[in-house]
Amino acid sequence: MEMTRGICILGATGSIGKSTLDVVSRHPDQFRIVALTGNHRVAEMQLLCQQHHPELVVMAAPEAAQQLRVGLGDAGLKKIQVESGPEALAEAARMSGVDEVMAAIVGAAGLLPTLAAVEAGKKVYLANKECLVMAGNLFMERVRQHQVTLLPIDSEHNAVFQCFADGKGVRRILLTASGGPFRTWPAEHLAVVTPDQACAHPNWVMGRKISVDSATMMNKGLEVIEAHWLFDLPASRIDVMIHPQSIIHSMVEYVDGSVLAQLGNPDMRTPIAHALAFPERMESGVSSLDLAHGPDLQFEAPDLQRFPCLALAFDALQAGGAAATVLNAANEIAVQAFLEGHLPFLRIAAVVEDTLGELQPAAPDHLDDVLAIDQLAREVALRHLARHGSGMQ
């Protein structure tokens, strides 16, 4: 009988974390939950603890951790260790009982614990884009150095991975994008978009930050940068195609004219199950795709005037240096301001563009350089935010 594989889920209370737990719970003979981490959703984390009984839980803030300790004590789960803070996050990722790490913390906060998993030689399921956007060269160097198995979880990159084979004869990859909730809106209506409207994605269930990124198409821009590092292709061989139905998750075109596509219902449990089982397959709980009765599949080129964030991401990738680190930091600041009602939707791109225009740092040699550039870019973005932010009308 095979031993179960110990798994740590970084970002367990987020949408990817919950989908991972759903898949894992279908295969109790294969997995055991060793560690879970979360940000501030104490009640949700307590419920996960009652369902999955991890050895360790890490919350971002000490207050949340203390609340959780009390709640677990009341529930008779005092044996579960509860910690807080960045170092505890990293420790969860490198625990001796952990074999595999689902890296699903959103944003720059996911970089250090994911690197900790890599340096500890764990198998890493990468759902955090920012590791590659902020520190692509350094991150992939560590992956090679520690001979780590790195499997992509983003539906687009997972689709490319499934179609990529050995990478021989690839002409280009085509990342598909839904176009978000505002693809067909009249341009004048975009000026008064609210956070709730931006977070209402037509096809996918996602967190608020990534939903806004989808609405601006910055999400696809970050995925272009991620694809560059994962598949070692220049920007000129990575294209984006709008596909509103989100049935084809991405395509790979070969020099002989063949185009391989991966299809499936828009449910993150599919790429998660693919990665968890690779090179085998496992049941995910996702329903079969019904092509006969499903929607017609449509495609269109993205309008870069309508989606300037996508153009900014391509520019940052081609500029090289630390431009992608600056892009990511400025976008996180701008999106948070929009979600809090301090910045109009259409000014998100302006904050990012102005920050990119002011900072052109060289490529970082060390992780400390990445973190310093990230911090500087946030400070510059906040200054531009003060100029562009006028609140929501």
Swiss-Prot record:
Organism of origin: Acidithiobacillus ferrooxidans (strain ATCC 23270 / DSM 14882 / CIP 104768 / NCIMB 8455) (Ferrobacillus ferrooxidans (strain ATCC 23270))
Catalytic activity: 2-C-methyl-D-erythritol 4-phosphate + NADP(+) = 1-deoxy-D-xylulose 5-phosphate + NADPH + H(+)
Residues given in the record as NADPH binding sites: 13-16, 128, 130, 207
MF (Gene Ontology): 1-deoxy-D-xylulose-5-phosphate reductoisomerase activity; manganese ion binding; NADPH binding
Pathway(s) annotated for this protein in UniProt: Isoprenoid biosynthesis; isopentenyl diphosphate biosynthesis via DXP pathway; isopentenyl diphosphate from 1-deoxy-D-xylulose 5-phosphate: step 1/6
Class of enzymatic activity (EC top level): oxidoreductase
Name of the protein this chain belongs to: 1-deoxy-D-xylulose 5-phosphate reductoisomerase
Family: Belongs to the DXR family.
